[in-house]
Amino acid sequence: MKKKRKIFGKIILITLIVLIVAAIAFSLFVYASLDKTVDINLLKRRDSSITRIFYYDFTDRKNRIGDAVELEDEAIFQSRSEWKSIYDLPQSLKNAFVAIEDKRFYDHKGVDWLRTAKATMNYLFRFDKGGYGGSTITQQLIKNVTGDNEVTPKRKLEEIFRAKNVEKFLGKNQILEAYLNVVYMSEGCYGVGAAAKLYFNKDVSELSLVECASLASIVQNPSKYDPFTHPENNKQRRKLVLKEMLDQQMIGEDEYNRSIDEEIILSEKIEENKSSGVFSWYTEALISDVCRDFAEKYNVKPEVARNLILKGGYDIYSLIDPRLQKEAEKVYHSYQAYIQNQNGTYPQSSCVILDPKTSDVLALVGGVGTKKGNLLFNRAISAKRPPGSVIKPLSVYSVGLEEGIFNYSTVFDDTPLEMEDGSLWPKNSPDRYRGLVPLCYALEHSINTVAVKALRHVGLDKSYDFLQKYGITLNEKDKCDASLALGQLTNGESLLNITNAYCAFANGGSMSKAKTYLYLTDSNGQILIKKDDEEKRILSRENAYIMTMMLKGVVDDGTASFINLKNSISTAGKTGTSSNNEDKWFVGYTPYYVCGVWTGYDTPTPLYYTKNPSCILFDKIMERAHVGLDLSNDFEEPFEILERDFCFDSGMLVGDNCNEDLRGSRALKGYFTYDNMPIELCNRHKSVYIDAYDGMILENPLLFWRKRRASLLEYTRNVPDEIHIEDSDYLIESRKRM
């Protein structure tokens, strides 16, 4: 019996030890997973209620040499935010908030354990359905700054550790000052300084005891205790505040009796704009970028970051070019002259201008017409639309060049592919098939069949990986011909990202991420965020130049040949159209700028134009952008580039037979590198004698006087008879007599 008891005791002991170890391990795991810190800089005083925006008057943008100039018209401010020193706040106000929100504020180290215990019991057993109410002023300050209001055990534990850490670095006066300046006071108002002006039209230092109690009443539920909208609720709550102040010996019986039934006189409610007015498209994108980066770096919610930035006290050093922004806006104000659809309606449009060497966003317009509000849908950065053929240089042509799979003159057969179900795909736009064409020509005329065939040489994985290097957002479903060769991306892509990717072509194969600003500083000049200027190389300088020459062909002789800018300065670019003609794109560049334009309806609807409207807008914008610049500037050709004449139909070096083609000389000039160029003469053109009357090949030309020498193509293809291939008449097989 004793032996059994000993064994049983050992089992219990071992079980307890295991449970204790498990509990400790679990506690350590939970502790390690908690975010226990909050950036102290977020809690410190902001001397200004204005966030200023600067631009740079660069003499050398690439090396960041230039002076910062304030954009006074773009200053950001909230009229209902005003930082007040703790020494400017009346004692009654400080006492009122402490009495009702955290009566042991001056005694605890960030956490009131008694209130926390009560709140925990309430959370577990729901004694009070109205809430849990265990947060100290320090904890509330952290919630106000981080925006983390989740009611979960994990969030509460994080809040506790954060509060204790804050109290290690800040004194009680600093904490109370920060809290009273950031706490939400209803009506879009933050802090007691702005609240005193709003509700009583007074400086906070002039507030009476009952007015102080009224402000302290708002905090628990701003919408419920708003003095303007719910004066009776506020009155009942401020009586409770005064009673707490009496019980905590912050006021005497006489003060309490005088104040308990005293009415407050509210100022007339004025509907104010919370900002300086309507921001430009650029400024709004800038604010969005700064807030996103701020939220990420300082671990706060995006809406909290936005509140902090809009409340003021920061300096943003933007990368805008005010002249270009103004010129782009002028074009979009006059949009009706450029983009009327054939059905008489006007679609939407957006544009982005980048510096190719730095990827600085110089100008940005998110919609047509005059911008009439804030937080509007910005189509330049937020619209995700299928890019169509604009993607081909990124996903196919540049990949094949860089990997040495093909070159400028590599020839593909422009014929449709037969799919498993017997259908022919893809179709070209317009619906024609030209036959043998070199890559440069296929890109100039946006030939879909060649893009798909070239992609299959490159491989889906390689194409997908390169697009990610370019910064294009992809879905696993995009590993298919339609997405990678024809631009029908599952989730679409933004104009900004597509335009940014083209910087790699314009900048010798390297690019950095597009950015609207360089620095965010506080009002004392301390840098809070610094944007990365680091470049990544995607293509060699030589292949980037070859891509530029191919894209220059698009503007000189291809789908964008009606662009007039090319007559003034070297211009390269690519058109794009999504399925059903629902999106029209053009991304182009000169030695100075990269500009992307998108046109379409917010709800995808077919577009009907004889000329791509995005090309027209690009032309108008870039014509204005280049005023005053040296237009003789050209794309810089690397020393290693070789220029050679090649045969259009074979991609090989031009031979004598290439000049006897019935269509005339088939020689084109191409751009190559030493290790990726044609080295043999054309062997596809064969010299034959044909009947001068009907053009058929003569088997025995010595016996036939009506003859002429010509070069025909030795090439065999298998396509359905109903498909007309334009170069079929120039194949040897088609000229043989039956």
Briefly describe each language-model feature range.
Residues 644-738:
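Low-complexity, Gly/Ser/Thr/Pro-rich intrinsically disordered linker/tail segments
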Residues 81-86, 347-348, 373-394, 408-411, ...:
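Short active-site loop at a secondary-structure junction
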Residues 15, 318-341, 351-353, 364, ...:
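A penicillin-recognizing enzyme superfamily signal
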